[in-house]
Amino acid sequence: MAYAPNVKNILVFPAGTEIALEIHDALKFSKFVKLFGATSVPCHAEFVYERCAENVPYVDDPALIDSLNALIDEWQIDYVYPAHDSALLRLTQERDRLHAAVVTSAEETVEICRSKNRTYEYLAGAPYLPQSYPDAAAVPSYPVFIKPSVGQGAVGARRIDDREHLDEALADGVEYAICEYLPGDEFTVDCFTDRHGKLLFAGPRSRARIRAGISVRSERFEADGGIMTIAEDINRRFDFNGAWFFQLKKNAAGEYRLMEIAPRIAGTMCVSRNLGVNMPLLTLYNMWGYDVSIINNGNAELLDRAFINRFRTDISYSTVYVDFDDTVTVRGRVNAILMMFLYQARGAGKEIVLLTKHADDIEESLDKYAVSPRLFNEVIHIRQGEDKTVYIKPDSIFIDDSFAERRAVHDNCGIPVFDLDMVESLLDWRA
Protein backbone atom coordinates (compact mmCIF):
# COMPACT_ATOMS: atom_id res chain seq x y z
CA MET A 1 0.00 0.00 0.00
CA ALA A 2 1.31 3.45 -0.90
CA TYR A 3 1.10 6.00 1.88
CA ALA A 4 0.00 9.56 1.21
CA PRO A 5 2.65 12.28 1.62
CA ASN A 6 0.98 13.58 4.79
CA VAL A 7 1.26 10.26 6.61
CA LYS A 8 3.39 10.58 9.74
CA ASN A 9 5.72 7.86 10.97
CA ILE A 10 5.12 7.30 14.69
CA LEU A 11 7.56 5.36 16.90
CA VAL A 12 6.05 4.00 20.13
CA PHE A 13 8.50 3.27 22.96
CA PRO A 14 8.44 1.00 24.87
CA ALA A 15 6.04 -0.83 22.58
CA GLY A 16 5.06 -3.71 24.87
CA THR A 17 3.30 -1.86 27.69
CA GLU A 18 -0.48 -1.72 28.05
CA ILE A 19 -0.13 1.98 27.25
CA ALA A 20 1.62 1.13 23.98
CA LEU A 21 -0.99 -1.47 23.09
CA GLU A 22 -3.74 1.12 23.58
CA ILE A 23 -1.81 3.59 21.40
CA HIS A 24 -1.53 0.86 18.77
CA ASP A 25 -5.24 0.02 18.91
CA ALA A 26 -6.13 3.70 18.66
CA LEU A 27 -3.88 4.51 15.70
CA LYS A 28 -3.61 1.33 13.63
CA PHE A 29 -6.51 2.24 11.32
CA SER A 30 -5.68 5.93 10.93
CA LYS A 31 -4.86 6.96 7.38
CA PHE A 32 -2.58 9.65 8.82
CA VAL A 33 -0.29 7.30 10.75
CA LYS A 34 2.25 4.58 10.06
CA LEU A 35 3.18 2.82 13.29
CA PHE A 36 6.56 1.54 14.44
CA GLY A 37 7.51 0.00 17.77
CA ALA A 38 10.70 -0.31 19.81
CA THR A 39 11.29 -2.46 22.89
CA SER A 40 14.14 -3.38 25.18
CA VAL A 41 13.08 -7.02 25.58
CA PRO A 42 11.08 -9.56 23.54
CA CYS A 43 7.43 -8.94 24.40
CA HIS A 44 3.90 -8.81 23.04
CA ALA A 45 4.79 -5.88 20.79
CA GLU A 46 6.13 -8.21 18.10
CA PHE A 47 2.64 -9.70 17.73
CA VAL A 48 0.87 -6.40 17.07
CA TYR A 49 3.46 -4.02 15.59
CA GLU A 50 4.23 -4.89 11.98
CA ARG A 51 7.49 -2.98 12.27
CA CYS A 52 9.16 -3.49 15.64
CA ALA A 53 12.77 -3.26 16.85
CA GLU A 54 13.98 -5.18 19.88
CA ASN A 55 17.04 -4.83 22.12
CA VAL A 56 16.75 -1.06 22.40
CA PRO A 57 18.56 0.06 25.59
CA TYR A 58 16.50 0.41 28.74
CA VAL A 59 15.01 3.78 29.57
CA ASP A 60 17.72 4.60 32.13
CA ASP A 61 20.60 3.53 29.86
CA PRO A 62 22.82 6.43 28.67
CA ALA A 63 22.86 4.81 25.21
CA LEU A 64 19.08 5.05 24.78
CA ILE A 65 18.93 8.34 22.89
CA ASP A 66 21.59 7.34 20.36
CA SER A 67 19.83 4.01 19.81
CA LEU A 68 16.46 5.67 19.26
CA ASN A 69 18.04 8.21 16.92
CA ALA A 70 19.43 5.39 14.80
CA LEU A 71 15.91 3.97 14.45
CA ILE A 72 14.46 7.42 13.84
CA ASP A 73 16.91 8.01 11.00
CA GLU A 74 16.46 4.52 9.52
CA TRP A 75 12.66 4.62 9.60
CA GLN A 76 12.30 8.37 8.98
CA ILE A 77 10.30 8.76 12.17
CA ASP A 78 8.39 12.02 12.65
CA TYR A 79 7.19 11.55 16.25
CA VAL A 80 8.16 9.41 19.23
CA TYR A 81 5.21 8.41 21.42
CA PRO A 82 6.34 7.52 24.98
CA ALA A 83 4.40 4.62 26.50
CA HIS A 84 5.67 4.48 30.08
CA ASP A 85 6.00 7.09 32.81
CA SER A 86 9.79 6.81 33.00
CA ALA A 87 10.13 6.89 29.21
CA LEU A 88 7.90 9.97 29.11
CA LEU A 89 10.12 11.77 31.60
CA ARG A 90 13.41 10.77 29.96
CA LEU A 91 12.33 11.57 26.42
CA THR A 92 10.73 14.86 27.45
CA GLN A 93 13.88 15.97 29.26
CA GLU A 94 16.09 14.96 26.31
CA ARG A 95 13.77 15.83 23.45
CA ASP A 96 16.27 18.34 22.05
CA ARG A 97 18.70 15.47 21.43
CA LEU A 98 16.16 13.35 19.56
CA HIS A 99 15.89 13.52 15.78
CA ALA A 100 12.07 13.47 16.01
CA ALA A 101 9.45 15.34 18.01
CA VAL A 102 8.23 13.81 21.28
CA VAL A 103 4.51 13.51 21.96
CA THR A 104 4.47 15.05 25.42
CA SER A 105 3.29 17.88 27.64
CA ALA A 106 5.40 20.70 29.09
CA GLU A 107 8.58 19.46 30.80
CA GLU A 108 7.71 20.95 34.19
CA THR A 109 4.29 19.28 34.10
CA VAL A 110 5.85 15.91 33.29
CA GLU A 111 8.46 16.28 36.04
CA ILE A 112 5.98 17.27 38.74
CA CYS A 113 3.48 14.56 37.86
CA ARG A 114 6.17 11.86 37.92
CA SER A 115 6.39 12.30 41.71
CA LYS A 116 3.32 12.05 43.91
CA ASN A 117 5.02 14.06 46.66
CA ARG A 118 5.94 16.83 44.22
CA THR A 119 2.39 16.78 42.88
CA TYR A 120 0.94 17.23 46.37
CA GLU A 121 3.43 20.03 47.10
CA TYR A 122 2.59 21.79 43.84
CA LEU A 123 -1.13 21.59 44.55
CA ALA A 124 -0.78 22.56 48.22
CA GLY A 125 -3.99 24.09 49.50
CA ALA A 126 -6.26 22.44 46.93
CA PRO A 127 -9.36 21.14 48.75
CA TYR A 128 -9.28 17.79 46.95
CA LEU A 129 -5.84 16.73 48.22
CA PRO A 130 -5.68 13.88 50.73
CA GLN A 131 -4.08 14.53 54.09
CA SER A 132 -0.41 13.64 53.61
CA TYR A 133 2.48 13.27 56.04
CA PRO A 134 6.22 13.91 55.55
CA ASP A 135 7.31 11.01 57.77
CA ALA A 136 6.10 8.42 60.27
CA ALA A 137 6.42 10.80 63.22
CA ALA A 138 3.83 13.11 61.68
CA VAL A 139 1.13 10.45 61.36
CA PRO A 140 -1.55 11.14 64.01
CA SER A 141 -3.59 7.95 63.59
CA TYR A 142 -3.88 4.75 61.60
CA PRO A 143 -4.54 3.25 59.13
CA VAL A 144 -2.62 5.18 56.47
CA PHE A 145 -1.93 4.44 52.83
CA ILE A 146 1.54 4.45 51.29
CA LYS A 147 2.61 4.35 47.68
CA PRO A 148 6.01 4.92 46.04
CA SER A 149 6.29 8.60 45.20
CA VAL A 150 7.80 7.66 41.85
CA GLY A 151 6.06 4.61 40.47
CA GLN A 152 3.18 3.40 38.39
CA GLY A 153 0.22 1.12 38.77
CA ALA A 154 -0.35 -0.38 42.19
CA VAL A 155 3.24 -1.56 42.66
CA GLY A 156 4.28 -1.03 46.28
CA ALA A 157 0.96 0.54 47.28
CA ARG A 158 -0.58 -0.76 50.50
CA ARG A 159 -2.51 -0.01 53.64
CA ILE A 160 -0.47 0.31 56.85
CA ASP A 161 -2.24 -0.27 60.17
CA ASP A 162 0.34 0.76 62.78
CA ARG A 163 3.62 2.59 63.40
CA GLU A 164 5.69 -0.58 63.57
CA HIS A 165 4.71 -1.67 60.07
CA LEU A 166 5.11 1.86 58.72
CA ASP A 167 8.67 2.08 60.06
CA GLU A 168 9.38 -1.30 58.52
CA ALA A 169 8.01 -0.21 55.13
CA LEU A 170 9.89 3.09 55.11
CA ALA A 171 13.16 1.33 55.89
CA ASP A 172 13.40 -0.20 52.40
CA GLY A 173 14.97 2.95 50.93
CA VAL A 174 12.05 3.85 48.66
CA GLU A 175 10.56 7.35 48.85
CA TYR A 176 6.88 6.96 49.67
CA ALA A 177 3.88 9.23 49.65
CA ILE A 178 2.20 8.74 53.04
CA CYS A 179 -1.48 9.68 52.98
CA GLU A 180 -4.66 9.27 54.92
CA TYR A 181 -6.37 5.97 54.25
CA LEU A 182 -9.24 6.43 51.79
CA PRO A 183 -11.81 3.63 52.13
CA GLY A 184 -14.12 4.71 49.31
CA ASP A 185 -14.34 3.81 45.63
CA GLU A 186 -11.41 4.50 43.34
CA PHE A 187 -11.73 5.63 39.77
CA THR A 188 -9.85 7.26 36.90
CA VAL A 189 -10.82 10.38 34.98
CA ASP A 190 -9.61 10.43 31.37
CA CYS A 191 -9.03 13.98 30.15
CA PHE A 192 -8.17 15.78 26.94
CA THR A 193 -6.81 19.31 26.71
CA ASP A 194 -6.65 20.95 23.30
CA ARG A 195 -3.72 22.93 21.96
CA HIS A 196 -5.15 26.14 23.41
CA GLY A 197 -5.24 24.72 26.95
CA LYS A 198 -9.00 24.17 27.01
CA LEU A 199 -10.30 21.03 28.72
CA LEU A 200 -12.54 19.40 26.10
CA PHE A 201 -13.25 16.09 27.83
CA ALA A 202 -13.26 14.61 31.31
CA GLY A 203 -14.64 11.09 31.46
CA PRO A 204 -14.61 9.11 34.71
CA ARG A 205 -14.49 5.32 34.79
CA SER A 206 -14.43 2.84 37.63
CA ARG A 207 -11.48 0.67 38.65
CA ALA A 208 -13.54 -2.33 39.71
CA ARG A 209 -10.81 -4.93 39.23
CA ILE A 210 -7.07 -4.25 39.06
CA ARG A 211 -4.32 -6.49 37.71
CA ALA A 212 -0.68 -5.36 37.82
CA GLY A 213 -1.86 -1.80 38.35
CA ILE A 214 -4.04 -1.84 35.22
CA SER A 215 -7.80 -1.55 35.47
CA VAL A 216 -9.13 -4.71 33.83
CA ARG A 217 -12.78 -4.12 34.70
CA SER A 218 -13.95 -0.57 34.19
CA GLU A 219 -17.31 1.11 33.70
CA ARG A 220 -17.79 4.67 32.53
CA PHE A 221 -20.15 7.07 34.25
CA GLU A 222 -21.08 10.71 33.95
CA ALA A 223 -18.85 13.26 35.63
CA ASP A 224 -20.62 15.17 38.38
CA GLY A 225 -19.92 18.76 39.35
CA GLY A 226 -17.30 17.75 41.90
CA ILE A 227 -15.26 15.79 39.37
CA MET A 228 -15.50 18.55 36.77
CA THR A 229 -14.38 21.17 39.29
CA ILE A 230 -11.29 19.10 40.12
CA ALA A 231 -10.55 18.42 36.43
CA GLU A 232 -10.82 22.10 35.53
CA ASP A 233 -8.63 23.14 38.46
CA ILE A 234 -5.90 20.62 37.62
CA ASN A 235 -6.05 21.64 33.96
CA ARG A 236 -5.65 25.30 34.95
CA ARG A 237 -2.60 24.62 37.13
CA PHE A 238 -0.67 22.39 34.70
CA ASP A 239 0.40 22.76 31.07
CA PHE A 240 -1.07 19.67 29.42
CA ASN A 241 -0.86 18.82 25.74
CA GLY A 242 -3.56 16.36 24.75
CA ALA A 243 -4.35 13.25 26.78
CA TRP A 244 -3.87 13.01 30.54
CA PHE A 245 -5.67 11.44 33.45
CA PHE A 246 -6.00 11.60 37.19
CA GLN A 247 -7.13 9.12 39.81
CA LEU A 248 -9.55 9.88 42.62
CA LYS A 249 -10.72 8.00 45.66
CA LYS A 250 -13.42 8.86 48.18
CA ASN A 251 -12.68 9.37 51.85
CA ALA A 252 -14.88 8.16 54.70
CA ALA A 253 -17.14 11.18 54.25
CA GLY A 254 -17.62 10.43 50.54
CA GLU A 255 -15.48 13.37 49.41
CA TYR A 256 -13.16 13.15 46.39
CA ARG A 257 -9.45 12.99 47.07
CA LEU A 258 -6.67 13.05 44.48
CA MET A 259 -4.42 10.01 44.20
CA GLU A 260 -2.20 10.93 41.25
CA ILE A 261 -1.97 12.68 37.88
CA ALA A 262 -0.27 11.42 34.71
CA PRO A 263 0.23 13.50 31.53
CA ARG A 264 0.07 10.53 29.17
CA ILE A 265 -2.15 7.88 27.62
CA ALA A 266 -3.67 5.37 30.06
CA GLY A 267 -3.85 1.68 29.22
CA THR A 268 -7.61 1.67 29.79
CA MET A 269 -8.38 4.80 27.77
CA CYS A 270 -10.01 2.34 25.37
CA VAL A 271 -13.15 2.98 27.44
CA SER A 272 -13.17 6.63 26.35
CA ARG A 273 -12.00 5.71 22.84
CA ASN A 274 -15.01 3.49 22.31
CA LEU A 275 -17.28 6.37 23.25
CA GLY A 276 -15.70 8.27 20.35
CA VAL A 277 -12.86 10.05 22.16
CA ASN A 278 -9.64 8.71 20.62
CA MET A 279 -7.05 10.21 22.97
CA PRO A 280 -3.86 9.06 21.19
CA LEU A 281 -5.08 10.40 17.84
CA LEU A 282 -6.46 13.64 19.29
CA THR A 283 -3.10 14.22 20.98
CA LEU A 284 -1.35 13.87 17.62
CA TYR A 285 -3.77 16.42 16.17
CA ASN A 286 -2.61 18.78 18.92
CA MET A 287 0.98 18.14 17.86
CA TRP A 288 0.06 18.91 14.25
CA GLY A 289 -1.57 22.21 15.18
CA TYR A 290 -5.14 21.18 14.42
CA ASP A 291 -8.17 22.59 16.21
CA VAL A 292 -10.32 19.65 17.30
CA SER A 293 -13.75 18.93 18.71
CA ILE A 294 -15.09 15.92 20.58
CA ILE A 295 -17.83 13.49 19.58
CA ASN A 296 -18.99 11.55 22.63
CA ASN A 297 -21.70 8.93 22.11
CA GLY A 298 -22.34 8.99 25.85
CA ASN A 299 -23.62 5.42 25.99
CA ALA A 300 -23.31 3.08 28.95
CA GLU A 301 -20.15 1.02 28.63
CA LEU A 302 -18.55 -1.74 30.67
CA LEU A 303 -15.08 -3.04 29.81
CA ASP A 304 -13.68 -6.32 31.07
CA ARG A 305 -10.25 -7.54 30.06
CA ALA A 306 -8.68 -10.97 30.01
CA PHE A 307 -5.52 -12.34 28.47
CA ILE A 308 -5.64 -12.71 24.69
CA ASN A 309 -3.81 -15.39 22.71
CA ARG A 310 -1.61 -14.29 19.84
CA PHE A 311 0.69 -16.72 18.06
CA ARG A 312 3.70 -16.89 15.80
CA THR A 313 4.09 -20.11 13.82
CA ASP A 314 6.58 -21.50 11.32
CA ILE A 315 3.84 -23.02 9.14
CA SER A 316 4.23 -21.93 5.52
CA TYR A 317 1.49 -22.37 2.92
CA SER A 318 0.15 -20.92 -0.30
CA THR A 319 -3.37 -22.41 -0.28
CA VAL A 320 -6.12 -22.69 2.33
CA TYR A 321 -8.67 -25.48 1.96
CA VAL A 322 -11.75 -24.88 4.07
CA ASP A 323 -14.99 -26.76 4.70
CA PHE A 324 -18.43 -25.10 4.70
CA ASP A 325 -20.85 -26.89 7.04
CA ASP A 326 -20.05 -26.31 10.71
CA THR A 327 -16.89 -24.49 9.61
CA VAL A 328 -17.66 -21.40 7.53
CA THR A 329 -21.06 -21.56 9.20
CA VAL A 330 -21.61 -22.65 12.81
CA ARG A 331 -25.03 -23.03 14.47
CA GLY A 332 -26.76 -21.19 11.67
CA ARG A 333 -24.40 -18.22 11.64
CA VAL A 334 -21.27 -17.22 9.76
CA ASN A 335 -18.08 -18.01 11.69
CA ALA A 336 -16.76 -14.46 12.08
CA ILE A 337 -13.34 -15.49 13.39
CA LEU A 338 -12.76 -17.85 10.48
CA MET A 339 -13.93 -15.21 8.02
CA MET A 340 -11.47 -12.77 9.57
CA PHE A 341 -8.68 -15.23 8.84
CA LEU A 342 -9.89 -15.97 5.30
CA TYR A 343 -9.95 -12.30 4.37
CA GLN A 344 -6.55 -11.85 5.98
CA ALA A 345 -5.18 -14.81 3.99
CA ARG A 346 -6.66 -13.45 0.78
CA GLY A 347 -5.04 -10.09 1.46
CA ALA A 348 -1.71 -11.88 1.92
CA GLY A 349 -2.03 -13.47 -1.53
CA LYS A 350 -3.05 -16.96 -0.43
CA GLU A 351 -5.41 -19.04 -2.56
CA ILE A 352 -8.62 -20.02 -0.77
CA VAL A 353 -10.48 -23.14 -1.83
CA LEU A 354 -13.91 -24.09 -0.48
CA LEU A 355 -13.93 -27.89 -0.35
CA THR A 356 -17.34 -29.12 0.77
CA LYS A 357 -19.80 -32.02 0.79
CA HIS A 358 -22.69 -29.64 1.39
CA ALA A 359 -26.05 -31.35 0.85
CA ASP A 360 -27.74 -28.35 -0.79
CA ASP A 361 -26.87 -25.96 -3.59
CA ILE A 362 -23.66 -24.37 -2.32
CA GLU A 363 -24.13 -21.13 -4.25
CA GLU A 364 -27.60 -20.66 -2.77
CA SER A 365 -26.25 -21.38 0.72
CA LEU A 366 -23.38 -18.93 0.29
CA ASP A 367 -25.89 -16.32 -0.85
CA LYS A 368 -28.14 -17.11 2.14
CA TYR A 369 -25.30 -16.27 4.52
CA ALA A 370 -24.07 -13.30 2.44
CA VAL A 371 -20.71 -14.98 1.83
CA SER A 372 -19.42 -14.00 -1.58
CA PRO A 373 -18.23 -16.90 -3.76
CA ARG A 374 -15.59 -14.46 -5.01
CA LEU A 375 -13.82 -14.88 -1.68
CA PHE A 376 -12.75 -18.31 -2.93
CA ASN A 377 -10.37 -18.93 -5.78
CA GLU A 378 -12.19 -22.21 -6.33
CA VAL A 379 -15.31 -23.93 -4.98
CA ILE A 380 -15.07 -27.73 -5.05
CA HIS A 381 -18.45 -29.31 -4.30
CA ILE A 382 -18.15 -33.07 -3.92
CA ARG A 383 -20.59 -35.85 -3.02
CA GLN A 384 -20.98 -37.46 0.38
CA GLY A 385 -18.56 -40.36 0.63
CA GLU A 386 -15.98 -38.83 -1.70
CA ASP A 387 -12.42 -38.46 -0.48
CA LYS A 388 -11.33 -34.85 0.06
CA THR A 389 -7.67 -35.79 0.05
CA VAL A 390 -7.57 -36.31 -3.73
CA TYR A 391 -8.38 -32.63 -4.28
CA ILE A 392 -5.67 -31.21 -2.04
CA LYS A 393 -2.34 -29.93 -3.35
CA PRO A 394 0.92 -29.64 -1.39
CA ASP A 395 1.97 -26.41 0.31
CA SER A 396 -1.48 -26.05 1.84
CA ILE A 397 -3.40 -26.07 5.10
CA PHE A 398 -6.80 -27.63 5.75
CA ILE A 399 -9.56 -26.32 8.02
CA ASP A 400 -12.50 -28.59 8.87
CA ASP A 401 -14.55 -29.29 11.99
CA SER A 402 -14.55 -33.05 11.28
CA PHE A 403 -11.81 -35.01 13.04
CA ALA A 404 -12.16 -37.85 10.53
CA GLU A 405 -11.60 -35.48 7.61
CA ARG A 406 -8.64 -33.84 9.34
CA ARG A 407 -7.12 -37.23 10.15
CA ALA A 408 -7.41 -38.37 6.53
CA VAL A 409 -5.88 -35.18 5.15
CA HIS A 410 -3.11 -35.12 7.76
CA ASP A 411 -2.14 -38.75 7.15
CA ASN A 412 -2.49 -38.84 3.36
CA CYS A 413 -1.49 -35.31 2.34
CA GLY A 414 1.04 -34.53 5.08
CA ILE A 415 -0.13 -30.95 5.56
CA PRO A 416 -1.14 -29.07 8.74
CA VAL A 417 -4.82 -29.42 9.64
CA PHE A 418 -6.91 -27.14 11.86
CA ASP A 419 -10.10 -27.44 13.87
CA LEU A 420 -12.07 -24.24 14.41
CA ASP A 421 -10.57 -23.57 17.83
CA MET A 422 -7.09 -23.59 16.26
CA VAL A 423 -7.73 -20.85 13.71
CA GLU A 424 -6.69 -18.21 16.24
CA SER A 425 -3.09 -19.40 15.83
CA LEU A 426 -3.20 -18.39 12.15
CA LEU A 427 -4.29 -14.80 12.72
CA ASP A 428 -1.79 -12.00 12.20
CA TRP A 429 -2.61 -9.00 14.40
CA ARG A 430 0.29 -6.83 13.28
CA ALA A 431 -0.39 -3.39 11.86
Question: Where are the regions that the model predicts?
Answer:
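ATP-binding N-terminal substructure of ATP-dependent carboxylate-amine bond-forming enzymes
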Residues: 1-104, 419-421
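Acidic di-acidic motifs
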Residues: 15, 323-325, 398-402
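Active-site nucleotide/adenylate-binding loops and adjacent lid/helix of ATP-dependent enzymes
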Residues: 109-184, 194-198, 225
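ATP-dependent carboxylate/phosphate-activation module, predominantly the ATP-grasp catalytic core
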Residues: 179-239, 250, 262-288
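Non-catalytic pre-domain segments flanking phosphatase-related domains
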Residues: 241, 264-322
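A short glycine-rich, hydrophobically flanked beta-strand micro-motif that places a catalytic Asp/Glu
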Residues: 241-253
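Conserved Lys-Pro-Asp/Glu-containing loop-to-beta segment of HAD-superfamily phosphomonoesterases
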Residues: 386-404, 409
